Amino acid sequence: MNALQTLQQRYDLGEARAIYELVLKQRFGLSRTDILLGKDTTLSAKDKEELQIIIDRVAKGEPVQYVLGCEEFCGRTFLVNPNVLIPRPETQLMVELVKQNVAPGNSVLDVGTGSGCIAITLALAGYNVTAIDVSDEALAIAKQNAERLDAEVEFVKADIIQCSIFNFQWSALVSNPPYICESEASTMEKNVLGYEPHLALFVPDDDPLLFYRVIADYGQDHLVDEGHIFFEVNSAYAKQVGELLKQKGYKDTKIVNDQYEKERFVWARKIQD
């Protein structure tokens, strides 16, 4: 059984091919053209053995990004491991929302930074970024990514729920917090549920807006006048998050769809009356 056939035990042909090409590109430096020219069939015996080990792990359900130890985000390669969420394509759109509405040079706080992909991308675009996370392991990965990509980000261990962090006025708050209700776990793909950190995924069923409420409250005290707040959200709660921001006194609240036409982002401004 070849690699594609092995992958097709779990994935359809299109997904299997995409994973196969990703592995060959990331681990062995082969382009799609190289594959079309058959260079994947001329790997050394050692490389073929490594390829088979990778394919077998992915076929059993382990996310290919964790197997390879990296994922692309906004054109850059970020280190990942099971202590951080795998950066999603849709999250790149939140970075673009920040860039479209907040000028470089302004201060940004990234709440729940994980791999650091949002914070680092914004820092490299010219923003002054501080990023927090409750997990030491996540912060270790984020710091490695910042060092590899030569990005200046201040990383701090902090829990937004338990403390009022930094007596500072920010131009923008950005967060992709846990937003999947615990009751939704049974509907999730096993390769997400079994490998990605539950701390970064789930929020209690009885308080799905927990993190949005806490961050919005923090923003009322620590955003500059006309400062922005940006959230990635569970599409089932986008309108509720928008209403929450309005209730907290934010203005110009907007809900933005992702590339899959799901309501994925909510942003607003703090405007003094």
What positions do the PLM features span?
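Non-catalytic accessory regions of SAM-dependent methyltransferases
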Residues: 1-36, 41
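Active-site beta-alpha loop architecture of Rossmann-like, nucleotide-cofactor-dependent enzymes
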Residues: 65, 180-183, 236
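Conserved beta-strand segments of alpha/beta enzyme cores
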Residues: 77, 128, 152-154, 251-254
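Conserved SAM/SAH cofactor-binding pocket of Class I
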Residues: 89-187, 214
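Mobile active-site "lid"/loop adjacent to the S-adenosyl-L-methionine
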Residues: 179-211
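Conserved Class I SAM-dependent methyltransferase catalytic core
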Residues: 205-269
